[in-house]
Amino acid sequence: GLMSQQRAGKAIATGFLARQIAPIEVPEGRKGTRLMRDDEFPRPEITLEKLATLKPVFRKGGQVTPGNSSGVTDGAAFVLVGDRAALEAKGIEPVARIVDWTIVGVSPRVMGCGPVPAIRALWEKRGMKASDIDYYEINEAFAVVNLHAEKELGIGRDVTNIYGGGISIGHPPGATGVRMTITAMHHLQESGQRYACIATGGFDKL
């Protein structure tokens, strides 16, 4: 949880996340308004000591707390998807290409394990291995989801969710997958890298 907050804080400070956000004017007070330019959920100033005081949410003595779980937040995200011919007809220059995708189901009892078989299926489908993909966005429903994926897949923390994730940015229902895709697209554009993998639970795309 701490790393996610720190990474989101850095992404905000450098303007990386701002480049993905369309500012909107929202009501404030009885007659006023304000321009929202940044996500409100990140807490980059939080400390490990503060996180350690948070109580388990599912069972006594458990390890899942509000500090290592995603926040259910309001949000919206938008991308335009089309084939090359349609984009060319409209004079739209694509910024990324969906190479492939997989959908893999797991038992609801282990729903947090979904990214692992889904990513493996994608690797197998494309004849790829972990190191062939430059960057991974894996939804931080809970921190343990990412820890499990890193361990089982052998992918480094330095190539996964480096701008924060669901724990720090939030997990708006219906928008998270697109938000992650936009972040991955910006990462590829700014880094000059080629492939990113987005894993939202059991559906992955490259």
Predicted segments, located by residue:
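N-terminal extracellular/periplasmic Venus flytrap/periplasmic-binding protein-like
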Residues: 1-89, 152, 157-159
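Generic structural signal for well-ordered, non-membrane alpha-helical segments
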Residues: 1-5, 17, 43-47, 69-73, ...
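Alpha-helical scaffold segments in soluble metabolic enzymes
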Residues: 3, 7-10, 50-53, 118-121, ...
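Active-site pocket-lining segment
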Residues: 28, 99-168
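Hydrophobic transmembrane alpha-helix bundles
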Residues: 34-65, 104-106, 135-142, 167-179, ...
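Condensing-enzyme catalytic core mediating Claisen C-C bond formation in acyl metabolism
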Residues: 46-113, 117, 124-125, 182-183, ...
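Internal helix-turn-beta structural module
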Residues: 130, 151-152, 156-161, 166-205
